[in-house]
């Protein structure tokens, strides 16, 4: 039972081909240290769920969030345009999300 609430400041995107189970994955980093992972499965595939993930060569775990591939565009926009960000996972309730770390001003893109 764990609760993760990890900040991150950079990411690395992979667009996979067969035979990978994930159609795409985004590894998240904080000051170069693995902080989380977002994976994308085929729409309708419910066999992949939010869970803990242990990066290779490490002794710690990070949150891994699973989304349908159809949401990759909105998540990439979120990563590109918002900061600071964090990834959160509660392994008891399985509640998981990406979020802005601070409040956003209303209408900040008005007039742009």
Question: Which residue ranges define each predicted feature?
Answer:
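Surface-exposed beta-loop interaction hotspot
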Residues: 8-17, 53-63, 106-112
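OB-fold ssDNA-binding interfaces and closely related basic DNA-contact patches used
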Residues: 1-44
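Short, conserved turn/kink motifs that form compact alpha/beta structural patches or helix kinks used as
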Residues: 43-77
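Low-complexity, compositionally biased segments
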Residues: 8-12, 19, 46-48, 80, ...
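A short, sequence-level motif marking secondary-structure junctions
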Residues: 40-47, 102-105
């Amino acid at each position: 039972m764990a609760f993760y609430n990890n900040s991150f400041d950079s990411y690395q995107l992979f667009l996979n081909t067969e035979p990978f189970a994930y159609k795409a994955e985004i590894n998240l980093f904080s000051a170069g240290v693995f902080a989380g992972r977002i994976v994308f499965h085929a729409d309708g595939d419910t066999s992949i769920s939010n869970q803990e993930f242990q990066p290779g060569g490490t002794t710690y775990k990070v949150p891994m969030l699973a989304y349908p591939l159809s949401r990759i565009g909105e998540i990439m926009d979120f990563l590109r345009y918002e900061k600071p960000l964090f990834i959160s996972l509660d392994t008891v309730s399985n509640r998981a999300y990406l979020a802005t770390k601070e409040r956003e001003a209303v209408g900040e893109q008005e007039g742009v």
